[in-house]
Amino acid sequence: MPRLLLAAPFLLVLHAAAQAPEDNRPPLFFREDWKEIAAVAPVTQEHVGNPALLLGLYGPGKDGVRKSHHDTPKDDPYYIWLGSCPANCAIALRDKDAFVDLTGLAKIRWRTKQTGFRSVRLTLKLGDGTWLVSDYAEGPSVDWHESEFSIAGIRWRRMDIKTIVEGPWVASPDLSQVDEIGWTELAPGGGTPASSRVDWIEVYGRPVARR
C-alpha cells in the first residue's frame, strides 16, 4: 500500500501531461466565415467578416466570384461560390498587419462542397510575390464537408496570377512569410452542376509582423 500511495502523485502528473495540448502547434492565425448579408457577385470587402482581413480577387473570371446564399434549405450557409466565373478565377485573403509562417505543423481547416468533377485547391502568395497552387485538392461531396490538412505534406506548382494557370513544380518553397491565402478551381465555373463552394476557412500558423 505505501508503494501505491507514493506512485499515485507520479501517475497523476503523467495523466495531466498526456491530457495537455502540445505546445509546439501553431495558433489560429485567422478564420473567415463571411457576413450574413445579401448574396452578390463579385464579392466585395463588405462581405468579409474578419476586420483584420483584406479580400483579393484574381484572374480573367474574377468578376464571377460570388458570395452566395439561399433561403432553402434553412441551414444553407453564406459561402463563396466560383461556379459563375466565366473564366479561371481565384480568391485570397491577407492579414493587414502580419504575414503568416506556414512551416512546421501549420494547417488549414475548411468547410466545402464541390459538385461534378470539381476540386478546390489552396493558393498562396509568398512574401516575395510568388504565387503557388497546391497539389492537394478537395474533391466533390454530396453534402458540406469539414476537412483539415497539413501544409507540410503539400507539393506546390507556381501559378500565374493573371491567368490562374499552374506552372512548373517549385521544390521546397519558403513558406515562412506567406502574404495571402486563398483557393481556386484552376478552371472556369461550371454553374451549379460543376463548381466549388467554401463556407469558412481557418488558417493555423504563426504571425510574422510586416515590416
Cite the ranges covered by each PLM segment.
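Positively charged n-region of N-terminal signal peptides that target proteins for export
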Residues: 1-4
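Beta-rich carbohydrate-recognition modules and glycan-binding surfaces
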Residues: 19-211
